[in-house]
Amino acid sequence: MLLSKYFLPILKEEPSEAQVISHKLMLRSGMIMKQASGLYTWLPLGLKVLKNIENIVRSNMNKVGALEVLMPCIQPAHLWIESGRFEYYGKEMLKFQDRHDNTLLFGPTNEDMITDIFRRNIKSYKDLPKNLYHIQWKFRDEIRPRFGVMRGREFLMKDAYSFDINQENAVNTYNKMYKAYINTFRDLGVFAIPVIADNGPIGGNLSHEFHIIAETGESTIYYDKRFKILKDNPDIDVEEIKSWYAAAEEKHDVNKLSSFPEGITSSKGIEVGHIFYIGSKYSVNMNALINDEYGKLIPVEMSSYGIGISRLAAAIIEANCDKKGIIWPFSVAPFKVSLINLNIHDNKCVELAAKTDKELSNKNIEVLYDDTEARPGSKFATHDLIGSPYQVIIGPKKAANNIVELKDRKTGVLEDIEIENLINYIRI
């Protein structure tokens, strides 16, 4: 992609309304643009990040056999009345009447609708288990939206819902999804810790939140130091991981700490995922019954699994940035390589840039080629800001000898590389 043809509205000054670094950097780098309080347009750079996160989440859901559906963002209120949750959300839930005086709402979550879908289509234990998920925009009318897309009013979520014949099977499914979440965050290039948490308005009696460690996190979490080995050992048994101590602040129990010889540490965290074993709360309230193997009608056992996709974009930045800008993990980066031509009027620079762009693109490595007239200092500032994992810098002196500079955005290390060997240094 040629930068001269791209839509990248960079802000030179820090936006005054931004309180956290991710909000500042998302606005400055042209990822998002504010439309109203808590509402943002996702511009091309930001949308690429959002799609990359979405695709990684989708891939991991598919691997555990979850089936994708797409429920409407507008829901009939009668389902929420039936489940008993309609009044609970209060003004946070946006409600309105259609032309036929039906009460509708902009869904903040989907337990009620998915239960309705299940009860209308599945009647026998033979059709279980089922695990359905969707990725959809949601709306919650926050009293005080803040921190950009971290706590906006409109947000993109992945919601999954599992249905099982009994508690034992439901917990087995829960454990599979627990592990799928660990794998998902690993694939996203972030370190997320699963902590015991409250279920809140969803209900149920087993719950884990997944927190990305970041100094700007709103929550304090306490966890066993062994969690750090998950980065390099993703195949550790789920039951072993769940035996390690990890708790959100409201669940922290100092009396249990002596049982964990490895030591407990605490950090600020940003919640990016939440999973719940719900049990039969919704199936009882909404009459979602199935025939068991003896022909008896019983309520189905449910669990709910959420990941905040738009929130993740901001949380990843909070955990991966410096004074110059964003440092994207390779898997979610909008462009993997920034190709910086320092002199677009030098024939050799143009030749090497074109060759590099073609070779990397042929390897399905997304490249943003800076072919603009901007000065070198301005170009470096722009590409440090947008955070491509690698920068390939082409200047006249070194280009004359078929040499380019390769910069690792995370480490800042610069290397002179012969153009023929460049592809070997891009670690995918």
Curated annotation (Swiss-Prot):
It is found in: Cytoplasm. GO terms for cellular component: cytosol. Its main location: cytoplasm. It catalyses: tRNA(Pro) + L-proline + ATP = L-prolyl-tRNA(Pro) + AMP + diphosphate. GO terms for biological process: prolyl-tRNA aminoacylation. PROSITE patterns: AA_TRNA_LIGASE_II. Its EC number is 6.1.1.15. GO terms for molecular function: ATP binding; proline-tRNA ligase activity. InterPro entries: aa-tRNA-synt_IIb, aa-tRNA-synth_II, aa-tRNA-synth_II/BPL/LPL, Anticodon-bd, Anticodon-bd_dom_sf, Pro-tRNA-ligase_IIa, Pro-tRNA-synth_IIa_bac-type, Pro-tRNA_synthetase. Keywords: Aminoacyl-tRNA synthetase, ATP-binding, Cytoplasm, Ligase, Nucleotide-binding, Protein biosynthesis. Pfam families: HGTP_anticodon, tRNA-synt_2b. SUPFAM superfamilies: Class II aaRS ABD-related, Class II aaRS and biotin synthetases. CDD domains: ProRS_anticodon_short, ProRS_core_prok. Catalyzes the attachment of proline to tRNA(Pro) in a two-step reaction: proline is first activated by ATP to form Pro-AMP and then transferred to the acceptor end of tRNA(Pro). Homodimer. Belongs to the class-II aminoacyl-tRNA synthetase family. ProS type 2 subfamily. This is Proline--tRNA ligase. The gene is proS.
